[in-house]
């Protein structure tokens, strides 16, 4: 019985952990039917605030590969040089703190435990994908995903996480039709 209680508590805590949150925003005055090609924007210079563990060529290939797959599936064609759209991405890593308080007094076996407050620190990563009009340099669409991250992921796990984030971001991408101003900012938790 004691082992079953621990397993149930672990499953509850795992289910309450940070999830991948996906958002998008766009300019409804642009008609995506007028665009057929895209290209990558210039590489971002690594600054002191950008963690080189996340800004690297391996993740660059993973993000671009997943975005390429999503955009070509929507009928856009990759074109080196002159194109209708320019795709940029950004990675932001922030330190976060969460405070978890146990309920006031609970019984654990033969012991009565007092309320405890635990402070947990973790890193939160945000992947932002921007799509801009290449002729005006105006932002047309922005999608982003935010989640807790772990620096100790295996390469296979990292690839799966990036693909999942990019796929969920592009689920918010308009389907090549004129968007309506009434829908504006969108959010979905996965």
Which residues are covered by each model-predicted region?
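Envelope-exposed proteins and targeting segments
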Residues: 34-36, 74, 83-85, 123-128, ...
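Sec/Tat-exported extracytoplasmic proteins
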Residues: 67-75, 91, 95, 135, ...
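Sec-dependent signal peptide recognition
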Residues: 2-8
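C-terminal/domain-edge helix-coil "capping" segments
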Residues: 17-29, 119-127, 133-140, 146-190
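Post-signal peptide N-terminal segment of mature Sec-exported envelope proteins
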Residues: 25-44
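N-terminal segment of the mature soluble domain
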Residues: 42-94
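Surface-exposed short loop/turn segments
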Residues: 85, 89-138
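C-terminal motif of bacterial Sec signal peptides marking the signal peptidase cleavage site
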Residues: 12-15
């Amino acid at each position: 019985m004691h082992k079953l209680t621990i397993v149930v508590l672990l499953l509850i805590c795992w289910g309450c952990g940070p999830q991948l949150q996906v958002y998008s925003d766009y300019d409804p005055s642009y008609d995506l039917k007028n665009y057929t090609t895209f290209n990558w924007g210039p590489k971002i210079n690594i600054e002191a605030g950008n963690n080189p563990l996340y800004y690297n060529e391996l993740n660059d290939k993973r993000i671009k590969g997943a975005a390429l797959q999503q955009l070509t599936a929507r009928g856009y064609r990759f074109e080196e040089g002159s194109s209708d759209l320019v795709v940029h991405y950004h990675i932001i890593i922030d330190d976060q703190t969460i405070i978890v308080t146990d309920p006031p007094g609970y019984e654990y076996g033969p012991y009565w435990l007092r309320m405890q407050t635990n402070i947990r620190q973790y890193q939160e990563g945000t992947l932002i994908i921007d799509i801009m009009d290449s002729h005006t340099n105006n932002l047309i669409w922005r999608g982003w995903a935010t989640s807790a991250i772990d620096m100790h992921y295996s390469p296979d796990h990292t690839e799966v996480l990036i693909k999942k984030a990019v796929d969920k971001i592009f689920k918010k991408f308009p389907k090549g039709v004129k968007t309506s101003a009434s829908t504006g900012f969108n959010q979905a938790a996965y």
